[in-house]
Regions:
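Catalytic cores of the polymerase beta-like nucleotidyltransferase superfamily
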Residues: 1-196
Length: 196
């Protein structure tokens, strides 16, 4: 069992490679190479890798509750590799979001930083926003918030993500863009039918 949804209470070595790989987070990380037998892939990792899919090994609720950081790792892999998260895995991520409260701020910051720097950051955070809203709840109000302005054709959240995706690959710039309109829904006003 795991302590605080992060660390195993104890580590037990197993003699079976299959059993060892079964304990991994995602199928793409649950493969091994044997110099005589070649690729050992019991859980479809190669197919998921080739198809660009992030999928938990076995029961996704069990994998994510063992180590809640896996929720943010799935998001990071989706961003870095420009992969999709398999629907059952994403639904389990959403069900287990509250476990992120057990994760240290340093680990969350590390995963968020890598996510923001990924080549697929727009699609990852647009398609799978809930983990971001759990760790930065102030951003939730931007999702779907229409700006009603001819200079802003996207809602605040999509505008934010497009800004990040089109910015230089500089973490400070991307962090600034993540927060640059976070307060807009709270101070929005209209004058002559135009949003400000």
């Amino acid at each position: 069992s795991y302590v605080n949804s992060r660390r195993p209470q104890s580590v037990t070595f197993v003699a079976s490679l299959r059993e060892d790989l079964r304990r991994r987070d995602f199928t793409i990380n649950a493969m091994a190479w044997n110099h005589t037998g070649g690729l050992m892939d019991y859980f479809g990792g190669r197919e998921d890798l080739e198809s660009g899919i992030i999928r938990c090994v076995g029961n996704p609720d069990e994998r994510l509750s063992e180590d809640a950081l896996r929720i943010l790792r799935a998001l990071r892999f989706a961003s870095e590799k420009d992969f999709r998260i398999e629907p059952d895995t994403y639904m389990a991520m959403r069900r287990n979001l509250s476990l992120l409260r057990n994760i240290s701020a340093e680990r969350i910051a590390y995963e968020l930083s890598r996510t923001l720097m990924g080549k697929g950051v727009f699609s990852a955070l647009m398609n799978y926003p809930e983990p971001l809203f759990e760790i930065i709840p102030e951003l939730r109000a931007a999702f779907g918030f229409k700006q009603n302005n001819p200079h802003h054709i996207y809602d605040v959240y999509e505008h934010t993500l497009r800004s990040i995706a089109n910015a230089d690959a500089d973490l400070e710039i991307r962090l600034a863009l993540l927060f640059h309109d976070a307060g807009k829904p709270l101070c929005y006003s209209e004058k002559e039918g135009i949003g400000h």
